[in-house]
Amino acid sequence: MGDPHRRLIQMLQSREFPALAPDIEIVPANYFAPLDLKSIYGRSAPLEVDLGCGDGSFLVEIAAANPARDFLGIERLLGRVRSAHRKIVQRELANARVLRVETSYAVQQMLPPDSVTLFHLLFPDPWPKRRHWRRRIVTEDFFVSVHRALVPDGLLRIVTDQIDYFREIERLAAQSTQFLISSDPEPPRAPSTFEKRFSQSEIYRLVLQKVSEVT
């Protein structure tokens, strides 16, 4: 595990920033172990994960529209987590939770295998300068982690307004043997904050379906 991940986990475990509410913000006792999702939600239901959920606008809308499913927003920034928390409380959503941790680390280390029905990756930071490309979330390793966490035939839904980044994601997807390009499932009823902001721009979408190993 890289130093940035370790520093973040140490910060959280020190409770420098206390949890907002234990029934909404997930604060694991062990950040190195998979989450106990049944204990967190009090049931077994299909799980959708909003990677980099921002202020929670998209998260609460899809959670409200789909009470038979559970929803997890993952966000690194405290201010955005507070905003998402507030929205969940205001809407009284029993099926929505938020986890404050680095997104790539959560996917790699904290989500159990075969646990996620659908990942939403909406407008990930494109890091347009070449020297910053290594910071982009979508990499070969990211695809491996997502594949492990998805249920059979599970989906990864990616939305961006950056054509160069989109082409790079397409290239990585085409090289992967773990996913097939799928048609978009029923569009969510509410756009994300970034989708509203970039509504006048060209928006690029890609949905990848997990390919399970043949046994």
Please report, for each region that a protein language model flagged, where it lies by residue:
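Conserved beta-strand signature within the Rossmann-like core of class I S-adenosyl-L-methionine
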Residues: P152-T160
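A short glycine-rich, Lys/Arg-flanked "PGG" loop and its adjoining helix->strand segment in the class I
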Residues: V138-P152
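Class I S-adenosyl-L-methionine
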Residues: Y165-T215
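Conserved beta-strand/loop positions that form the S-adenosyl-L-methionine
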Residues: L51, I74
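Conserved SAM/SAH-binding beta-strand->alpha-helix loop
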Residues: L77
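S-adenosyl-L-methionine
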Residues: M1-V49, S57-N66, H85-P113
